[in-house]
Amino acid sequence: MKIRINDLARELEVKSKAILDALTKVGVTEKKTHSSSIEDHEAVLVKKYIHEHGTEESPRRRSAGEDEFKPKIDLSKISKPGDVLKALTQKAAPPPPPPPPPRPAVKAPSPVSQEPRPPAVPPAPQKPAVFARPASETVHTPPEPPKPRFITPASVAAQRPVITPPKPPVPPAPPVAVAPPAVIEPAAPAEEPKAAAPATTAPEAPEVKAPVSPERVAPAADTGAHVTAKPEAPAAPGAATPAPTPGRPLPGVPLRQQTPGRRMIVPQTGPRPVYSAPPPAPPRPTPPPQMSQGAGTRPGMPVRGQPIFQRRPQSGPGGGSGGPGGFQRPGGPPRPGDRPRGPHPTRQFPSGPRPMGGIGLAPPGAPANKPAGRPAPARRPGQRYVPRGQKEGPMKGFVPPPRLSLSNEPLPITRNITISEGISVKDLAEKLGIRAKDLIARLLARGVFATVNQTLEASLASEMANHFGASTDVITFEDQLAQETAKAAGETPEEAAANAVVRPPVVTIMGHVDHGKTSLLDAIRATDVAGGEAGGITQHIGAYKVAIGDPNSPAFGREIVFLDTPGHEAFTRMRARGSKITDIVVIVVAADDGVMPQTVEAIDHARAANVPIIVAVNKIDKPDAMPERVKKQLADRGLMPEDWGGNTVFVDVSAKQKTNLNLLMEMICLVADLGDLKANPDRMASGTVVEAKLDRGRGPVATVLVQNGTLRTSDNFVVGNAFGKVRAMFNDRGVSLDTAGPSTPVEIIGLETLPQAGDQFTVVADREKARDISEYREGRAREAQLAKSSRVSLEGLAEQLKTAGQKDLPIILKGDVQGSVEVLNDLLSKMSTEKVKITMIRSGVGAITESDVLLASASNAIIIGFNVRPERKAQELAVQEGVDIRLHSIIYELQDEMKKAMLGLLEPIIKETYQGRADVKDTFRIPKVGTIAGCQVADGIIKRDSHVRLVRDNVVIYTGKIGSLKRFKDDASEVRNGMECGIGIAGYGDIRSGDVIEAFTSEKIAADSLH
C-alpha cells in the first residue's frame, strides 16, 4: 500500500517540502517530488520523525510575530451571511480589562523621555482639522464602545486630562493649513502665553515625545463629531493623578499583553513617525514670476511636483486677493481676518518636498534632479525581483535572434567546400557548419523565401557560402554520387585500380551515307539489320555486342560493342553523341566513292572526342574500287596510313564478300589493349542513354550503355530529368537479363518519363533522392524554356517587324525514337527562310494520338509522322477535323515534301507580257458609250482582251482593260502595227490627244524558289 506525499502532508498539516526533507533524514535516498508516492513503512518513519523533531520553519515564518498567527474561527454554526460578521466581531473584541486600583503618579517608563528643554513642543496632531469653534472650547466625545486594542503612540505616552484655566483674551491663532489625511503638518513654535490656555504647557515643563512604535498605528475612531486634536503635555508638578478614563490605562501603568485576535487590515501607506516642529525657516527671497517653474526649465513648462496650471485665484471671498484662502502676495504678511487655505495636493510643501513623498513628489532620499518618467510598478508582497528586460513564464530564457542588419558584412574566405546542383538548405548548412535557421535568415535578407528542404541554385548556394566564409566547387549530381560511392567503399586510388577489370571496347562506326556501315556490321554480327531499315538507310543509333567466334583468331572469345550511327548529314548530333561514349571510331569509306562530306565530318567528331581512329575501306570487291586513292585523300586530311609511315590503321574489307572481317576485329582489340580499358564491376552502375523511345505496350523505353559498375533489376536510377526503377532489361537480341556489366548495351523498362538521348544514367540507393533531383532538373528546364520564350528585346522587336510579312507553317512532329525527333527538329528549323518560317508546335516520341489531332485542328498545323502511325481514333478524328497527316519513313522524302509545302504557302508570281503600243491622235464622245480614242498602232499588236495602261507624259495615269476595239465601224479582235483603230477603255473616259496606250497580258505562276 502506498500513499502520496501530498496526502501525507495534508494529514500531518505540514508542507510537502517537510515530508521530502524527512524522507532524506530517515534514509530514503530515492529522489521524490510532491506528487510521488511512498510505501507505508516509509510513511510511518516520516510521521515518527516529524512528531519527534518537528519541521523547520522558513525564516519568514520564524521571524513573524506571535500576532501573525491568529486562532481559527468556528464556522460550524453559521447559518446566514450576517453570522459570519458577528462571529468575526466577537472574536476580534477582547473582554475589557478590569480597572486598576488607584495608585500615585509615577514616572513614565522608558518610552517617555523627560529632558529639560526650552519651550516644549507638543507632538504634531495626527489629523489636523479646521477649527469649527473657538480654540478654547473643549469638545467632549462620548465614551467609545469596546474595540480591539491597538498600540498607538498616544497610548504609550502618559495620558492626562486637559486642565482648563481661566479664559484670558486669546490672541488670533496662526493660520493652520488644512491637509488631506495621512499628511503631517509641522506645528509652529509655541509662544509663551501670558496666562494658561488649553492645550498649552508651562515653560518649565519638559517636552514629552511619543516614541515611534514598530506596531501598526491605528487611526482614531470616528465618533461622528468634529474633534479638534490638541497636543498633550505632562501635568505640572504636584498635580493630582487624574482618574482613569474608561478604555484607557492609567499613566505609567505597563500594558498587559492581550490574547491575539483576528488581525484587522488597516489601509495605511506605512508607519508614520511623529515629527517635532522644525525651527522657523529663514525668509527666502521671492523668485521672479517667470522663473517660478524651477531652475533650468523654460517658462511655462510643467515641473515635477508642481500643479500643471498655476492660475492666479480670483478676488472675492475664499478666492480673492485678500479674502480667506485667496492669493497671498509674495513675502507679504496675511491680512487680519484671513482664514488659512490648504495647498493643492500637488503643490510643493513650503519647506521642500514632503518627507513621505506623494503623488507628483519626490520620495525621501530620492535625487532632486531625477528625470521625469513613468514610475516603475511596485512589487507585490512575496514577489521576487526580476531585472528589467528578462522574460518570465514560457518565454523565460528566450534570446531573440540578432537583427538581420547587424550581420550583413560577409566573413573572410577561410575554407573550400564542394556542392552539387540542387543542394538543399539543410545540406548546405551542414557543409558550412552553421545552423539552418541562420542560413534561412540570410536568404530572407537576400529576398529568397526558402525552407529547410528546398533546393538552391548553384549560383545562389555559392553566394551564400561566400557570405559565410567558404569558397565553392560546383559539381554535378552524378559526380557527387561517384565521390560518395568511392568514399563509402573506402578504397584508395591504388586499390580502386587494382579492383578494376578489363572491359570490352565500345566501337562507333561512322561514315558517309550508303558507304556500307550497316552492311559491314551485319556481316560481323551475321544478321540482316540493313534489310530492316527504311530505304536501306540507318536512321538511329543501334548498339550491339559481338563476340569473336573464330577459333583461329588470336582474339577468340573477346567481345566488342558496336554503335551504328546514321550517315546522313542531318544526323550530326547523333554522330557527335556517339563519339563521346565510344573508345574507338571506325571510319567506313567506300573504295569507289572516296572521301565524302560526311566522312570529313565523322573525322572531325572523332578528333574532337580524342579517340583513336581505324579506317575500313569497304567495297573493295567492286571493279572500280580504288583503295589507294582513299588512302591519299585521307592522308591529306591528316590520317597517315601505317604502311606509309603513319599511325592510322587501314583495313581493306568487303561486307558483301565478308573479306578481312576477322582482321578488322583483331585490329580493334589491339588498339583497345593499347588504351588499357578497365572498369570496376562491383560499383553501382553508371552509363549513358544511347536512344529513347515510347513503346505503346511498355511505355518509355531507353537503350543504355553501361560504362561502369553492374546494373541490376530493381535498381533506382536518375537519368537527366527523368528517374525510375529497372523493371526489366533486354540485350540487343531481345533476351531478358538480370544483370549487365560494364560495356553492355541494354534496353531498360521502368522509366517515369522519357529521357533525352545522351543523358547520364546513374543508379542511386534512395528513390526519394532520385525524385528530388529529377524534379529540380525538370523545374530548371521549364524555367529556362519560359525565360527563353518570354524574353523581349529591341532586337527581337526589330526582327518581328522585319518578318511581319513572313508566312508561317505550323507543324506537329512525332517520331519513333528520341534521336530521330531531335534530328528532324534541327532539319526543319534550318529549312525556314525569310518568306516561310516553320514553327514547331509540338514534337515528341510515340504514335499520333487524338490530342495531337485536336492541337493541329486548333492551330491549323500539319502532322508529320516519322516511322510512326496514327491511332485508329486519331485517324477518324483527323478526317472529321480536316487535319492533314503526312507519314514518312525516309528523311529525304520528308525533306522534299516540306519544301513543296513551303512553296505552296507563297503567293503566286504575276508575270506580264508586252503586246503593243498605240498613240492617241484624237478623241470623240459617243452617247451611252463614253469617250473613244482614235489611235494608230505604233508597235506590236492590240488585242480585244488585252490589259492596257494609259501613259501621259511618261506617267501611268490608269491601268485597266479594253472596253471596245473597232476598226472603222466594225468590231475587231486585234489591230496590228501601222493600222488605225478606235479604243475604248472600260470605266475610264479621261483620254486626251497625245496619250499613249500600252497593251499587255498578265498571268500567275507558282513560286519556284523559297528565297
Swiss-Prot record:
Region: G1; residue ranges are 511-518
Tell where it localizes: Cytoplasm
Q: Where is the composition biased (Low complexity)?
A: 105-115, 187-212, 228-242, 361-380
UniProt cross-references to Pfam families, sorted A to Z? EF-G_D2, GTP_EFTU, GTP_EFTU_D2, IF-2, IF2_N
Does the keyword section mention 4Fe-4S?
no
User: tr-type G domain: from which residue to which, for each copy?
Assistant: 502-678
User: What are the binding positions for GTP in this chain?
Assistant: 511-518, 564-568, 618-621
Task: From the UniProt entry, list the residue stretches annotated as the region Disordered.
Answer: 49-152, 187-407
Ranges of Basic and acidic residues composition bias in the record: 49-77
Biased-composition ranges, Pro residues, are: 93-104, 116-126, 243-252, 276-290
Q: Which GO terms describe its cellular component?
A: cytosol
Which stretches of sequence are listed as region G5?
654-656
Q: Where is this region: G4?
A: 618-621
Region G2: start-end pairs? 536-540
Gly residues composition bias: residue spans: 316-329
UniProt entry keywords in alphabetical sequence:
Cytoplasm, GTP-binding, Initiation factor, Nucleotide-binding, Protein biosynthesis
Keyword DNA-binding: yes or no? no
Q: InterPro entries per the record? A: EF-G-like_DII, EFTu-like_2, IF2_II, IF2_N, P-loop_NTPase, Small_GTP-bd, T_Tr_GTP-bd_dom, TF_IF2_bacterial-like
The segment annotated G3 runs over 564-567
Named from the GO MF annotations, one term is: GTPase activity
Name the PROSITE patterns for this protein.
G_TR_2, IF2
The record's similarity note reads: Belongs to the TRAFAC class translation factor GTPase superfamily. Classic translation factor GTPase family. IF-2 subfamily.
The entry's function note states:
One of the essential components for the initiation of protein synthesis. Protects formylmethionyl-tRNA from spontaneous hydrolysis and promotes its binding to the 30S ribosomal subunits. Also involved in the hydrolysis of GTP during the formation of the 70S ribosomal complex.
Matches recorded under NCBIfam families: IF-2, small_GTP
HAMAP family assigned to the protein according to its UniProt record, in alphabetical order: IF_2_B
Q: Please state what the protein is called.
A: Translation initiation factor IF-2
Native organism? Koribacter versatilis (strain Ellin345)
